[in-house]
Amino acid sequence: MATVLHSESRRLYSWWWDSHIPKNSKWIQQNLSDMDSKVKAMIKLIEEDADSFARRAEMYYKKRPELMKLVEEFYRAYRALAERYDHATVELCHAHKTMAEAFPNQVPFDMIEDSASSSCSEPRTPEKMPPGIQPFYDSDSATSKRGLSQLTEYLGNSETEVESLKRTLVELGAEKEALNLQYQLSLNKFSRLEKDLEVAQKDVSGLDERASKAEIETKILAEALAKLEAERDAALLRYNESMQKITELEESFSHAQEDVKGLTNRATKAETEVENLKQAHSRLHSEKEAGLAEYNRCLEMISNLEKKVRDAEENAQNFSNQSAKAEDEIKALRHELVKVNEVKDGLRLRYQQCLETISKLEREVSHAQDNAKRLSSEVLAGAAKLKTVEDQCTLLESSNETLKLEADGLTHKLAAKDQEIFQKQNELEKFQSLIEDEHSRYLEIEVSLKTLQSLYSQSQEEQKVITSELQSRIGMLRDLETRNLKLEGDISSVKEENQNLSELNDSSMIFLETQKCEISSLKEIKEKLEEEVARHINQSSAFQEEIRRLKDEIDSLNKRYQAIMEQVNLAGLDPKSLACSVRKLQDENSKLTELCNHQSDDKDALTEKLRELDNILRKNVCLEKLLLESNTKLDGSREKTKDLQERCESLRGEKYEFIAERANLLSQLQIMTENMQKLLEKNSLLETSLSGANIELQCVKEKSKCFEEFFQLLKNDKAELIKERESLISQLNAVKEKLGVLEKKFTELEGKYADLQREKQFKNLQVEELRVSLATEKQERASYERSTDTRLADLQNNVSFLREECRSRKKEFEEELDRAVNAQVEIFILQKFIEDLEQKNFSLLIECQKYAEASSFSEKLIAELESENLEQQMEAEFLVHEIDNFRGAICQVFKALQVEADCKTADQKIAKERIPVSRVLGEINELKCSLSSAEYETQRLVIENSVLLSLLGQFQSDGMKLESEKRDVEKDLETIVHHYGMLKKDRLELLEMNRQLKSELIDREQRELELKAELQTEHLKFENLHESYMALHQDYSDALGKNKSLHLKFSELKGEICILEEENGAILEEAIALNNVSVVYQSLGSEKAEQAEAFAKNLNSLQNINSGLKQKVETLEEILKGKEVDSQELNSKLEKLQESLEEANELNDLLEHQILVKEETLRQKAIELLEAEEMLKATHNANAELCEAVEELRKDCKESRKLKGNLEKRNSELCDLAGRQDEEIKILSNLKENLESEVKLLHKEIQEHRVREEFLSSELQEKSNEFGLWDAEATSFYFDLQISAVREVLLENKVQELTGVCENLKDEAVTKTTEINQIKETVGFLEFEVSELKTQLSAYDPVVASLAEDVRSLEQNALSLMKLPVPAGRRREGVQNDEHQEAAVSQEPVGHCSTNLDNGIVLLQDMKTRIKTIKQAVAEEKKRRGKLRRRSSSHRSKDRKLFEEIELEDQFSGEIRQPRSPAMTESKNGSLMKDIPLDQVADTTSYGRSRRTSRGSSDQMLELWEEAAEPESSIKFLINNKNSKKPLIPRLHRRSRNPSVESQSEKMVGVVDKLELSRSTEDNAKILERLLSDSRRLASLRISLRDLKSKLEINEKPGKFTNPDFARVRKQMKEMEEAIFQLANTNEILSNEIEETGDVRDIYRKVVMEKSRIGSEKIEQMQQEMQNIERTVLKLEEGATKSKGRRKFSESRTVILLRDIIHKGGKRTARKKKNRFCGCMRSSGNEE
């Protein structure tokens, strides 16, 4: 009929249908799109693959509520469409009736009946309705009837509305068809979902069958365990733990019995619930005849559940019987454990003895392993051992693979179970097999690591021994001989002990092989048991959750049914009279029957699960037994470790075989070391001989120099004697004799010069010979190096071969290390897996606590598993600890060798830090490379030592040559001494010559007259000769310069010698030029004093004068016959002086060897030389006087040329000169006495020097002994230097890195210098700006004054508005204070002190007080206006005015309010349905009422929004008005709600205007701005917290709903409040400090800025947290509204408003009086 009606209506109202097609209706399109999206989401949830039981459980339990939500939302959308369709059909019926009555001829009357019947049957549109939605639809039937009655009345009154209703009816018909199609599609999808759920339930039943099969398999496994009981004698080592586990199992049995009782109680409860359901179904059966059959089905399902409960009880009884059997078995096991413990004690004693012997052997081996080549032999032995261990590992792996195959066969038997359980089982099996394999591998690797550690420690010890041997090889030879003897005895003892141990090892190996078989079988059983335990635990947890959820669903169904019945009674509807309601109830009954079927299926599943639980309990008993056996397996694995240790001992025995080979290598090494030591001894001897030869050469050179100086002194003495004679005869000497003397002098000087050149040539020849010998030695060295290179090539070949062997061994070692590392990684993964298992076990414990009795059994099992896992972890930690110790040893080796620079920084950062594996491997490789390089360097050093020994041999030959040269020099010294004797003979000859001269004087007096005539001619010749003499003197000075270059070692005395030589040359020139004898004697006395003080200085210039002086003496003796007596006296004195000089020379010969030692004494004598220099200065003065005398004498000579005939005058002058000479002789005698006293002093000093020499000789002997010790230490340091050379190579890399860093630092320093220069420039610029700002500060005075006036005017206006008295006498003070304020503000940043500063501060304080008064007045005015607003809120006219004012304020602060309003509207409208076009025609009166009732709350909210918005607006206002100078009082007075903020803003305006004063004030202003913004943000956060608190208090009232999220939100809010309070306090403290301090330091300002920045970041975080809290609160509110809507959907907004709008009649309940705008919108927060 509906199709006929649709076709007829479409034909009659085509124009209306065309306008109301779904494509043309936006509302229909939106709802259809929503329904499509929800249907797609449902399909996605349904179509997901549920291959495993867990996924099906997720679909059933987790995704079921999502499906329910989607179905409910889908039903709402469909409900809206159905209501609209119902509304349209009713309107069409009424319109059709009216048209039929008006036009009976045109409209057939049958269509009316059809339409009426269809309208009656239309409400049955939802064929399948969810149980929770039925009450919503029941209440709509009454409302629809009322709406129809009102609509007919409305149609009877107006015909115009009929046409519009026709159009809407046609549109609704079209929409109804579309909705019917969509609804059918959704129902099909829903049926698919139900089918999927049924399939899932069938799968659950299949799982139950598989569980039964698994039980059968567990029985088979139990039988296998019974067979294995005979083999557990040697495996049960933990008796105490097993006893504890047995007690726990007994407790678990008792708990299991209690669980069975609990299940019976639950079954009784289920029966009571079934009875309740029967009563409910009976009620429904009385009202609904169609649902009786379905309720009968439910009863049948309940009976099935009862049967299943009975089966569960039977299973519990079987379980108790099994527990009794298990107790009997436990008793038998206890007896067996006693026996096993006895066997275990004996084995422990043996094992301890073996460990003690092993420890002794290890100690002895560690002491015996001292040589370098032991590492290679031990590495070979270790490689062989590793191969054997790898073979054993392969055997174990093959056995494990067989075990895995058996386990796989068992898993194939259990493959019928669920795929997910199968996957988990496989994963557990893999992990457990990996655990066992890795445990066995780890034990084997432990053994290998121990061996490698021992090898490594041995290598370390060997390296240390090598270094010690290199440091002290000379002393170590004897020690090595003694050690070798000891080692041979030790090795023999060790071999004997090894033989004993090998016998013990053979016996233990046989025992261990028997245990291995038992351990392998026990491992398999343990794996199976652990897998089954994990399975059963997971299944029990899932079953318990399903039982809980089913009970919850049953309770919810009962509650829903009761609610439905109550709602039917409240609606006052009779089901018998209302056919429509009956049909709807039938639909609901059908749904309920389906639900009952589902419940019955669920209950069947539960019963099956209970059976499975019983089976699981049975299996757990078996699993416990298997766990006990697995413990025995673990003990067996530990015994394996003992086996491996014993094997290690056997391997050590094999090591001792290699020790013999090592002994041969040691003997070779010892021979090499002995050769090296001999070479080193020779080297040391040669070095000492070289040093002695060098010292002797230096001594010889110094002696030669001393002899030369002594020779010169002798010559000087002779020259002095000749000068004395000269002084006596110079006045009487003839010009001819002078010319002859000068010619002889020239010839003699040339001869001496030639002699000196010959000596130089001889020395040069010697140097060239030495060079030639050195060249030959170099050639020999090159040939020797070539030979050594060939040897080196051979050695390098050998070394390369050894390196290849080392590399192969290193590779094997690295492979073993990689295996160890992999084992560690796998152990770490297993530890994580164990931790995950512990977490899972903990979750199972929590679930078992809820199910008290059943969970206790599982908790104990989990505790046992955890204890076992902890034991395994302890073992793993023990192994990890050993690995850490190994790593620590590696780190110590690295530190000792300084291989890695990062070790030091790592030790500084973290003590005993674990090195990553990759890093350890890299470092080990580096160590190996360094070891190879060290070996290569040692070989290279050996070769270098051999080369050095050859060089030392050559140096020894050179030393022999030098000794021969030394002998030659000694011969030369003997010749010199002989020459000295010849000189003495010459002296005697000179005395004879003096006698002859006396005889010749008589003859010369006769010739005197002749000579006087020839004086003039000869004087000219004399001048020419004098010039030639000066040239010769210059040549001589050049020669002296060359001699000075040879005496560079005496650099300190060089300058003094040069000065003395120059002075002596000047004195000699004057002595030759002058004929004055007195002057000659003075010069001689000064020279002697200088010579006595200087101890033989180079006075070679006097040697050249000796020959000339002899001739002069001959000529002068002829003239001075009258003065023979004086000359004899002088000769006697000179003889005495010569004797003293001879003695001094002898002393000098003794002192020549001590020149090197006495250099320090010469430094002390430098002071005496300074005194001598003072004496020389006095002599200089005397020389100046002598020069004057010489000039006078020259004048006299000229006069003598003129006065040739005046011989008488000249004779008189000669007499005068003779008198003067007598006086001078007296002076010279006094000087001689002084010299004698000085010579005595020198004798005393010489004696002291002799004493010193003796003391120094004793010290030299002591030092020689010390040098012997130092030589030994030097050899050790030499080898230390070799080691340090290796380190230098490493340090060079570090230095290069550091140089790079230094270069970077230099670049940074350059950049910093540039920056500093820039800063200096900026500082200068800033100083210039400060000077300008100082000038500008004066301009701010009127600004401050104007600000004070503005404040004053604001005060007057505010007080006049408040009708308060203005304080008198403030204008003048205010103006003055303002002026002072301007001065203070302008002067504070600069730092000047003035009187205006105090006045300005007073003015600002006065302004603060005024602003506070204004603030109080404004606050009072606010309160007063608020009271007026509250009083006037009752009147509508005043309300409208206030609303307009609020709108104005909103416009004023709309920028701040706009962001909040959308969020609030979205939060209110986000979760509701879309609006229907009919619903938009809402009643304005209801909206008006709602607006009036919520006026108070809106006013409060507006005030809060204004307070929150005020700070931000004030900040913007301040920023916008930075540069303005106008008064801002009216606007601020109008806008500000918080006068304190206004005062702060006014202050901030002043601060912002003064930001240009200086950098410090700008920083302070920025800090204040940040602090103010932070305080305002905190204020807004406080306000929002208050709002949220109020909302929570409203939503948390009793009777509404309870949600644990509220407690969490409250905690967050409390934490927010505390944080806000702390931040507010810190902001206040910082702002007060800045305001009080004013111009602070940059450091303090930076600290404050950092604190403010941190505070702002915290505030941002708090704002984000506040947003999250607001979201959670909104979600909670939405949840509350949804829960309200579910309970009170009968009073839903859409239905109520549609009914009210259309019908405008009927009674309204108290709940309908709530003011709502539309049913599709939520009410305000107050209504909620």
From Swiss-Prot:
It comes from the Eukaryota. Residues 1419-1441 are annotated as: Disordered. Expressed in root meristems and at very low levels throughout mature vasculature. Signal peptide: none annotated. InterPro entries: NAB, NET_actin-binding_domain. Disruption phenotype: No visible phenotype, due to the redundancy with NET1B. Net1a and net1b double mutant shows a significant acceleration in root-cell expansion. One of its GO terms (molecular function) is actin filament binding. Residues 1424-1439 have a biased composition (Basic residues). Residues 13-92 form the NAB domain. GO terms for cellular component: cytoplasm; cytoskeleton; plasma membrane; plasmodesma. The NAB domain, also called NAB (NET actin-binding) domain, is sufficient for F-actin binding. Belongs to the NET family. Interacts with F-actin. Plant-specific actin binding protein. Associates with F-actin at the plasma membrane and plasmodesmata. May be part of a membrane-cytoskeletal adapter complex. This is Protein NETWORKED 1A.
